[in-house]
Amino acid sequence: MRSSPESRTSSSPGSVDDGGRTGTIFNIQRFSIEDGPGIRTTVFMKGCPLRCVWCHNPEGIEGRKQLMWFDVRCIGARDCLKACPLGALELGKDGMRIDRERCDGCGLCQEACPAGAIEVVGRRITAREAFEEVARDEAFYRNSGGGLTVSGGEPTMQPAFVAELMGLCREAGIPTALDTCGYCADDSLERLLPLSDMALIDLKLMDEAKHLELIGVELAPVKRSAATISHAGIPVWVRTPIIPGCTDTDGNIANLECVYYDDARPEWPRVVQCAEALWATSQQPHC
C-alpha cells in the first residue's frame, strides 16, 4: 500500500528529523542561479517521498547517508574493500556491489580509495552550521536579490531543521525560498511557508494514473499543496521538468495550464520551462 502525506508525522518515513538539532543534507550549492531569483545558496536536504523514473538526484532519495561508486574512476585497487570493517563491499566483473544493510556510512572506504571512485553522500549538519555556510555570500544576495533556497530531496521531510535554518537566515536579513515537490504533510508545509519569502513547486504530470505510475505517489496531495502555496501570499515559481514524450505532451501541458488558471494568483510571477511559452500565447482553457 502506498503511503499518503496525511498518514505521516513531521518525521516522515525516510526522514531524519531530530527536532531541529541536526539535518541530513547531500549538498550546499553556492552561486545557484536556477533555484529562485538572483544569486542563491541552495541547501539540498536528503530524503524524498517520490520515485520519479527520471530522477535527477537519486542520491537525495534516501534519508540517510549512503555510498556512491563511480565506475569510470575505479582503477581496481581494492583498497576500499580492505578498509571496510563491515565487509559491505564486493568488487566483481559487474562492478561494485554495496550491501546497504551493512554499510553504516563510516567513510573509511572513501578515505582509502586512491582514485576517488567511492564517496559517502550525505552529512549531518546543524542548522547553525548550515546558516554559517549560507551567510558567507550575504553580499551577493543583497546585490542580486538572491538568498537561501532549501531544496532536496524534499525539505518538508525535515521540517524542524529547515524551520530553524530559515529562521536564522531571516534574522540575518537573508531572503528564503522553499523548493518542494508538493507531496508533503500539511502541517510541515504550513510550518515552513510563513518562514519563506517565496516558494518553488514542481508540477510534473497532471494525469492521476501516469503520476502514480511514473512518480510513484498520488497526484491529489500535490495539487492540494499547490493550492495551499497559492494562498500563502508569497511569490511562486512553478517548474516542470522536460521529459520527452512524457511531460512535454500537448495533453499534459494543457492540464498544467488548467491548474495554473485555477490556482494562479498575482503572486505567481513566473512559470518556467516548457509550459511558459504556451501560457504566454494561449487563451484561458475551458477545463
Residue ranges and their predicted role:
Residues V53-G60, D79-I98, L108-R124:
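Iron-sulfur cluster-binding cysteine motifs and their immediate structural context
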Residues M1-P37, P244-C287:
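Auxiliary Fe-S-binding modules of radical SAM enzymes
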Residues G38-R40, K93-G95, A115, G145-G147, ...:
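Short, solvent-exposed beta-strand edge segments and adjacent coil->beta transition regions
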Residues W69-I75, G122-D137:
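Extended, non-globular alpha-helical segments
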Residues R128-W279:
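Conserved AdoMet/S-adenosylmethionine-binding subsite of the radical SAM
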Residues I25-D79, M96-G105:
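N-terminal pre-triad scaffold of radical SAM enzymes
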Residues T42-F44, E90, T149, A177:
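Short, conserved beta-strand segments within well-ordered enzyme catalytic domains
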Residues I28, K46, P58, R100-E101, ...:
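Fold-independent oxyanion-binding glycine-rich loops
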